[in-house]
């Protein structure tokens, strides 16, 4: 991945995780397409490529073939997304990675349950642990169970939900962002984190996802200058932008609003999805047009790089699939176009 693929590489020489996260979102999107009823082998081919790239030594933190890695260690962030990709590949009909899929899944269970707070360590020597990442880990285990017929996700899910309800609820009822309390914002619900958490919870705990989604809309859904989005921080809390949030404009978070499209699709909220999509389309079209303009193109790349477009792709294909299946979705159609 180059700086033309991922905006963050223009700011940080060796960022962690944006490459595997982009591949994970792509894999989810192509799984959505494969389950839409379209008779084509293209989705599986695309997910297969995502697996290949995810295992590549330039993406995986071990810098060598995983079969030659004796212990997977505490690379929870990479492994949560790799396991998601492997789950999507298996559910799309792919074979050949069963041993790796089983190994990664069992390791994620181990490093989750060995912690008193039920949150696996995400990066060696980094204390911070986001609740959304543990939800992603459990979702990846749920995908594994769907493919392999097991029940690995149940205990990590029960332990995590119990811990969050007892220890990590903000006064709004929303879950806090970071559970080790090592950041100023740790006890705050953040938009980018909440949207991801809700999306991942929708698989293994749909009722919890809908409950948090309702609170998320109540406290952080906001309209500014005619555009609908989601706040990165609660009104009144002074927090800045960072690589996770992307730009925060007039209170609205770029990452929070983009990821909220996934959360809306995953919870079947077509009205909010279409509201966000309608607001995003002219902004994305403008950003695409500015990619050729020096200096200004740095801003446009935030919304048009591989991570951003993969998130949009995953959200749009998710909602389109639910509409086709008639699962609590109106008959209104959403375009598959990313812009």
Map each language-model feature to its residues:
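Extended ligand-binding clefts on enzyme/binding-domain cores
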Residues: 99, 127-255, 268
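CBM-like carbohydrate-recognition segments
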Residues: 2-19, 209-339
């Amino acid at each position: 991945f180059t700086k033309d693929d991922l905006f963050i590489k223009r700011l940080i020489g060796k960022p962690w995780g944006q490459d595997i996260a982009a591949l994970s979102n792509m894999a989810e999107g192509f799984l959505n397409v494969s389950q839409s009823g379209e008779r084509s082998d293209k989705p599986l081919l695309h997910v297969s490529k995502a697996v290949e790239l995810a295992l590549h030594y330039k993406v995986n933190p071990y810098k060598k073939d995983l079969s030659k890695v004796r212990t997977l260690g505490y690379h929870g962030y990479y492994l949560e997304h790799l396991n998601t990709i492997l789950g999507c590949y298996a559910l799309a009909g792919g074979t050949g990675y069963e041993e790796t899929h089983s190994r990664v899944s069992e390791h994620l269970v181990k490093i989750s349950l060995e912690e008193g707070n039920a949150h696996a360590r995400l990066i060696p020597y980094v204390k911070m642990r986001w609740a959304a990442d543990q939800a992603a880990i459990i979702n990846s285990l749920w995908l594994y169970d769907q493919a392999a017929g097991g029940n690995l996700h149940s205990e990590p899910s029960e332990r995590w939900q119990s811990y969050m309800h007892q220890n990590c609820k903000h006064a709004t009822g929303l879950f806090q962002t970071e559970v080790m309390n090592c950041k100023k914002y740790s006890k705050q619900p953040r938009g980018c984190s909440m949207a991801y958490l809700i999306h991942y919870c929708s698989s293994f705990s749909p009722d919890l996802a809908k409950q948090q989604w309702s609170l998320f809309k109540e406290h952080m859904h906001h309209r500014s200058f005619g555009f609908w989005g989601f706040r990165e921080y609660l009104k009144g809390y002074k927090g800045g932008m960072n690589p996770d949030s992307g730009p925060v404009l007039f209170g609205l978070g770029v990452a929070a609003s983009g990821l909220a499209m996934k959360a809306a699709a995953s919870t079947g909220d077509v009205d909010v999805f279409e509201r966000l999509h309608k607001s995003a389309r002219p902004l994305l079209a403008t950003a695409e047009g500015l990619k050729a303009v020096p200096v200004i193109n740095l801003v446009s790349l935030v919304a048009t790089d591989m991570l951003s477009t993969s998130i949009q792709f995953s959200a749009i294909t998710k909602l389109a699939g639910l509409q086709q299946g008639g699962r609590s979705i109106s008959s209104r159609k959403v375009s598959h176009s990313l812009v």
